[in-house]
Amino acid sequence: MVDFTAEEKAAITRLWGKMNVEEAGGKALGRLLIVYPWTQRFFDNFGNLSSASAIMGNPKVKAHGKKVLNSFGDAVKNPDNLKGTFAKLSELHCDKLLVDSENFRLLGNVLVIVLANHFGKEFTPQVQAAWQKMATGVASAVARKYH
């Protein structure tokens, strides 16, 4: 279980309220597929993933990235119950989709990079620490069924 301080929750919620989920989600998933190309194997039905520009411009990547980041919204709303919040997604990714659980950690790290790039000076080390903690907590919760 991840324990968030009131300050961490406030920092996460403050940034979340300013976030364009569609844009940030697409960028995060796109970066994951570019930086860690072996993750592309889970997205065979997404069409052209042959280059960085093809990936970043792919509407299916953008749509799925939005869907993924909307799930992070559930975490922002329920930071004290990440395991419960992600129980069904954990089961889906483990039992049906057979996604390597390490990919959730990688995606969380990429999301933190996307947020830092977008929010600049507003993404202070304290805000980064809060978001990194959230990303790690979400990755652990989604990977829970694997253990």
UniProtKB/Swiss-Prot annotation:
<dbReference type="InterPro" id="IPR050056">
    <property type="entry name" value="Hemoglobin_oxygen_transport"/>
</dbReference>
<dbReference type="GO" id="GO:0031838">
    <property type="term" value="C:haptoglobin-hemoglobin complex"/>
</dbReference>
<dbReference type="GO" id="GO:0042744">
    <property type="term" value="P:hydrogen peroxide catabolic process"/>
</dbReference>
<dbReference type="GO" id="GO:0005344">
    <property type="term" value="F:oxygen carrier activity"/>
</dbReference>
<keyword id="KW-0349">Heme</keyword>
<dbReference type="InterPro" id="IPR002337">
    <property type="entry name" value="Hemoglobin_b"/>
</dbReference>
<dbReference type="GO" id="GO:0004601">
    <property type="term" value="F:peroxidase activity"/>
</dbReference>
<feature type="binding site" description="proximal binding residue">
    <location>
        <position position="93"/>
    </location>
    <ligand>
        <name>heme b</name>
    </ligand>
</feature>
<dbReference type="GO" id="GO:0031720">
    <property type="term" value="F:haptoglobin binding"/>
</dbReference>
<keyword id="KW-0479">Metal-binding</keyword>
<dbReference type="GO" id="GO:0019825">
    <property type="term" value="F:oxygen binding"/>
</dbReference>
<dbReference type="Pfam" id="PF00042">
    <property type="entry name" value="Globin"/>
</dbReference>
<comment type="subunit">
    <text>Heterotetramer of two alpha chains and two gamma chains in fetal hemoglobin (Hb F).</text>
</comment>
<dbReference type="GO" id="GO:0072562">
    <property type="term" value="C:blood microparticle"/>
</dbReference>
<dbReference type="GO" id="GO:0046872">
    <property type="term" value="F:metal ion binding"/>
</dbReference>
<keyword id="KW-0561">Oxygen transport</keyword>
<dbReference type="GO" id="GO:0043177">
    <property type="term" value="F:organic acid binding"/>
</dbReference>
<feature type="binding site" description="distal binding residue">
    <location>
        <position position="64"/>
    </location>
    <ligand>
        <name>heme b</name>
    </ligand>
</feature>
<comment type="function">
    <text>Gamma chains make up the fetal hemoglobin F, in combination with alpha chains.</text>
</comment>
<protein>
    <recommendedName>
        <fullName>Hemoglobin subunit gamma</fullName>
    </recommendedName>
</protein>
<keyword id="KW-0408">Iron</keyword>
<dbReference type="InterPro" id="IPR009050">
    <property type="entry name" value="Globin-like_sf"/>
</dbReference>
<dbReference type="GO" id="GO:0005833">
    <property type="term" value="C:hemoglobin complex"/>
</dbReference>
<dbReference type="InterPro" id="IPR012292">
    <property type="entry name" value="Globin/Proto"/>
</dbReference>
<comment type="similarity">
    <text>Belongs to the globin family.</text>
</comment>
<dbReference type="InterPro" id="IPR000971">
    <property type="entry name" value="Globin"/>
</dbReference>
<feature type="domain" description="Globin">
    <location>
        <begin position="3"/>
        <end position="147"/>
    </location>
</feature>
<dbReference type="GO" id="GO:0020037">
    <property type="term" value="F:heme binding"/>
</dbReference>
<keyword id="KW-0813">Transport</keyword>
